[in-house]
Curated annotation (Swiss-Prot):
One of its GO terms (biological process) is indole alkaloid biosynthetic process. PANTHER family: ERGOTHIONEINE BIOSYNTHESIS PROTEIN 1. Homodimer. 4-dimethylallyltryptophan N-methyltransferase; part of the gene cluster that mediates the biosynthesis of fungal ergot alkaloid. DmaW catalyzes the first step of ergot alkaloid biosynthesis by condensing dimethylallyl diphosphate (DMAP) and tryptophan to form 4-dimethylallyl-L-tryptophan. The second step is catalyzed by the methyltransferase easF that methylates 4-dimethylallyl-L-tryptophan in the presence of S-adenosyl-L-methionine, resulting in the formation of 4-dimethylallyl-L-abrine. GO terms for molecular function: methyltransferase activity. Its EC number is 2.1.1.261. Keywords: Alkaloid metabolism, Methyltransferase, S-adenosyl-L-methionine, Transferase. Pfam families: Methyltransf_33 (PF10017). This is 4-dimethylallyltryptophan N-methyltransferase easF.
Amino acid sequence: MPALPVIDIRSNHVEDSLPEQIIKGLTSQPKTLPPLLFYSNEGLEHWNHHSRQPDFYPRRQEIEILKQGGNDIARSIAPSSVILDLGSANLEKVGYLLEALEAQEKDVLYFALDISAPQLATTLKEIPSSNFRHVRFAGLHGTFEDGLRWINETPEIRDLPHCVLLLGLTIGNFSRQNAAAFLQNIANHALTGASKNKSSILLSLDSCKVPTKVTRAYTSDGVVPFALQALTYAKALLCDRIDNGIDEKVLSCNLRPEHWHYLSEWNFALGRHEASLIPRFGDVCLGSMLQDIVVKKDEKVRFACSYKYDAKERQKLFLDSGVDQGMVWTNEGCDVAIYELKLA
């Protein structure tokens, strides 16, 4: 079976800016690490293992919704649509939707977007494209912003109906204010144009605010190596700068995974889960390559948040984003739901 096409739509190489993002985050208060640092190829392997654990309810619930409601969700997507998947790390979940579209004989174009070229190649290789006649597939190598620019500006694409998939609770990784801005940006790029009345966003949100359930989900097997792998990746990126001649001399970089441990917390005030790295033994000097930054004992270096949305917060998110809620798909007892959104 021939390899599916991949289009490189990158406006710049993210790897080139990550070292600057690392330094900026570590010199801020509170200290942070950029989320993209955690999604190297090795990091994604650890995350995929973690997300399959029994206690990690978000993935399981989302799969159940797509498996049971796939036909209804597929009916909401217009014929001739361009489907832009902004979270295509693996196709196990969205596969149910694609199979439903094929069964309904809807001619659509599915584009899997990923910032990692190897991960994108793996994703596309897993697609049994020979089983599909109506759904056609391709990959897009780039960031969210690259994907939105592409769907808005590509002549043969921009006037077709668009369906943007934002599954995997991706919107929960943003602060509430930034989530509204990001969702509005998607709407402005993908829900405008000649077919705006036929275009939509399919968004998943989690409403669970039970601290024990949430923290148990984010401490299940696989999450610790996922978190610590980012330190190895960060050091590799920083050392590459030296090899490329950006620095004139070899500098020290103290990012040893064994000196850190993973911390999982529920923030009651903000309604979010927080994931951080914290020194294991005492103060850690990160070395001259990182401006001799010192992380104090018990000081948190936050790298991820997962916001949960109750009904009031969800309503405000959609209002601030300039979108209207259409259909909603969930199952009894589920905290996760998938929302159809249209331009207001």
